[in-house]
Each structure stands twice: as C-alpha cells, then as structure tokens.
C-alpha cells in the first residue's frame, strides 16, 4: 500500500481515459509518467545485452509492452503469434516508430539463449526485444506498467494477456488485450500514434460484414495466428485435410488439451512439436462443443478447398 499512497496510479492514463487527457495537458502527462514513475532497472535482451528499462526501452519512444514466458501452455504462444502478425501488418513502423517489448516472468528458465530461440520461432524481427532479468525487478516493472495481476502470484499460466501501448514523450498509455485481432491491434496502434496509413474511405463504401458463426469466429480469433486451411504452414501446420488424416477422437483431445497430450509423449504431438520448432500449442480452454464445431468447420473448409490437391499432397506427408 505504501507505493499506492506515494505514487500516482496509472489507471486513468493506461486505460486511455479521456477525462484524464482533458485534465492533464500533454506536458503534464509526460512529466507524470516519466523517469520518476517508471523503474530504470537493468534487464538482459535475447542477445545478452544489458539495458535499462526506462533509459533504453521507454524514454523518448513509442512502445508495446507485454509479459510472456517460454514454457507457458496457456496464452503466451497465442500472444506472441498475434504480435508477430501485428509486426507484419505494421511493416517498417516496427523498429522505427514503435518498439515491441516482451518481458519474461520466468527469468530462472528464460535465459537470453532461450528467449532468442523463442523469438526466432515466432519470426520476431528488428524492433522487437525479449527480456529477462531479476525476478524482483521484473515484478516492479510489471506493477508500474499496469501489467501485474492477482493471478500472477498463484500461477504464471493465470497471468493476464495484456498489451500496454504507450507514447512515453506525451505520457499517453492504453491497455489492450494481447490476444485481440491482429488487424484491430495494428489499427489501434496506428490511430493511437497518429500515423497516416493511407487514404481513409467513407463508411458508405464499406462492405457489409458477413454473418460469422461460432466455429469460424473461434478459428479466426484463436487459431489463425498460427494455422491456415489450405494456404501452407505458418507458425503451426496447415490444417487442410487434417480431419481426414487424424482420428476424430485424437483430434478432439489434442485441440482441447494439447499440453496434456504432449506431456504424455504422444508420438504425433511430439513429432509436430519437433517439426514446428518446439512451439507449444496453447490450451485455449475450449468446451467439448466448441471443439466439435471447430473440427466440423475445418473439415468443411478442407472440402471446399478440395481443388488444391497440391497442398493436400504436401500435408499428407506430415507426421
């Protein structure tokens, strides 16, 4: 409670509260959320370089910050896969106009070497740094960044998949879900940082959005960051024809509890884990009904793509 009384809390600013923006002009916000608030603790990058959190990673920069750890079986792989898509969508902006910062909450395991391998698995490019350090320093950073949660203390897998977007020079901060739609996150950053991403169109020209059922929504929101159906492998395998290659019971169990199936050293799960650079499929906590609907929909999409025999042949050779 001592810190809460002595330091202003980030709540309004970090949530992008309009009232706070009106009360505190940009100069005042920048002073409020600057060197006196953010810790300048030392951290170590995936390349083994020692950096200081405020001076080297925040000061004078626009950033997107999240917490991860490489042994995570829940949201972390999905978070990182989604950010990888955002990185591609933003293109040259990353590393120039905005910097991605992913901090491990498992520093005893996540050495610079482990983080470097993890970054490579998810195709992290320039402008995206992965960090480790002392646990007490990481806890302080997480708290001051508004990324700490009560569930973190009980279980790392319970940590909140939040993404803190900030403009340090102006003192403006906003929290988003790190597992949101990548196009939405990219557009949110572009708007927040006032980038010109090309000519805007009138709403009158907008296409009518198609009705989306539960299964396609689940695939787009949970699976599409790593998988395609008929467009080749990504971070994970192409799912074209997977409902024909795998027994339905095995597929349902693997989708529902991939961490358990892998821990049992299932030969198919182990072969996929090794083939796709040891990227863990996250446990998305899907219900049996959601899993069943997803399998049916993937099968339907595979049949609709039936003309793509070249893709099906390639996928048939997978373990």
Where are these regions (language model features)?
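A short beta-strand-turn-helix
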Residues: 42-62
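Short active-site neighborhood of thiol/selenol oxidoreductases, capturing the structured segment around
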Residues: 55-77, 83
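The canonical Cys-X-X-Cys-His
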Residues: 73-76, 163, 215, 219-229, ...
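Structural microenvironment flanking redox-active thiols in thiol-disulfide oxidoreductases
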Residues: 80-124, 128-131, 135-140, 247
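Short, internal strand/loop/helix patches
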Residues: 117-160, 268-275, 280
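C-terminal capping alpha-helices of c-type cytochrome domains
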Residues: 137, 141, 160-171, 184-195, ...
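Electrostatic cytochrome c docking/interface patches
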Residues: 194-219, 235, 318
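Gly/Gly-Pro-rich "capping" loops immediately C-terminal to redox-active cysteine motifs
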Residues: 228-260
